[in-house]
């Protein structure tokens, strides 16, 4: 199954805010309407919607998300928390959380087009897994820096999560540590996602 490229507002109206997909938010009152409908939802649908939230927020295909779930299941610790850490430490998401892109798809384009370096080397793989002490920089070329500067200027000022540091004037971000669960930028019940996949096998 490919990445979703359809109307974004349609998704947030059904699933709630998906900041990685779009900066738009559901209209006031839509949460109440969704809650009134949720009384009739089956447990399967609740798990499915949590899975879809995760998939659309991070811009993954079904195959990619399943792969991450399997990796998380083999790791030590809570499968759900490890899953979120894996997704949050992707390079495209790190750029998004640093404010260098307004959405994760936009961050993915920056990476694909060779605008981003990790530890001094161009990385053009959006799924690259960042590690503590990684230094993310924008390529030292005018078009790359102008592009990112415009995005930084356009992004709404938000407090950075504690696992990241941004040096705006150097066009540089630093990964301080693996992200804490409380700093994940999406309202999600990751256990329901894990449960969804465990029931599919």
From Swiss-Prot:
Residues in S4 RNA-binding domain copies: 89-152
Q: Where in the cell is it found?
A: Plastid, Chloroplast
Q: What are the protein's GO molecular function terms?
A: mRNA binding; rRNA binding; structural constituent of ribosome
A Gene Ontology annotation in the biological process aspect, one of them, is: translation
UniProt keyword terms in alphabetical order: Chloroplast, Plastid, Ribonucleoprotein, Ribosomal protein, RNA-binding, rRNA-binding
Instruction: Spell out the PROSITE patterns in the cross-references.
Output: RIBOSOMAL_S4 (PS00632), S4 (PS50889)
How is this protein annotated for GO cellular component? chloroplast; chloroplast stroma; plastid; small ribosomal subunit
Subunit structure, briefly?
Part of the 30S ribosomal subunit. Contacts protein S5. The interaction surface between S4 and S5 is involved in control of translational fidelity.
Q: What does this protein do?
A: One of the primary rRNA binding proteins, it binds directly to 16S rRNA where it nucleates assembly of the body of the 30S subunit. With S5 and S12 plays an important role in translational accuracy.
Report the protein name in the record.
Answer: Small ribosomal subunit protein uS4c
What's the source species' lineage?
Answer: Eukaryota, Viridiplantae, Streptophyta, Embryophyta, Tracheophyta
């Amino acid at each position: 199954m490919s990445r979703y490229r359809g109307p974004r507002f349609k998704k947030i109206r059904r699933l709630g805010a998906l900041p990685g997909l779009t900066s738009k938010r559901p209209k006031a009152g839509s949460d109440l309407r969704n809650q009134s409908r949720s009384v009739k939802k089956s447990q399967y649908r609740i798990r499915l919607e949590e899975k879809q939230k995760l998939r659309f927020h991070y811009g993954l295909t079904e195959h990619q998300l399943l792969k991450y779930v399997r990796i998380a299941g083999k790791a030590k610790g809570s499968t759900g928390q490890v899953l979120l850490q894996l997704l949050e430490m992707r390079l495209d998401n790190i750029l998004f959380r640093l404010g260098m892109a307004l959405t994760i798809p936009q961050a993915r384009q920056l990476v694909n087009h060779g605008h981003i370096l990790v530890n001094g080397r161009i990385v053009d793989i959006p799924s690259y897994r960042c590690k503590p002490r990684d230094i993310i920089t924008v390529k030292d070329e005018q078009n790359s820096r102008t592009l990112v500067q415009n995005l930084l200027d356009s992004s709404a000022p938000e407090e950075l999560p504690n696992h990241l540091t941004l040096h705006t004037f150097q066009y540089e971000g630093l990964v301080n540590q693996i992200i804490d669960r409380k700093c994940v930028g999406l309202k999600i019940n990751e256990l329901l996602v894990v449960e969804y996949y465990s029931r599919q096998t």
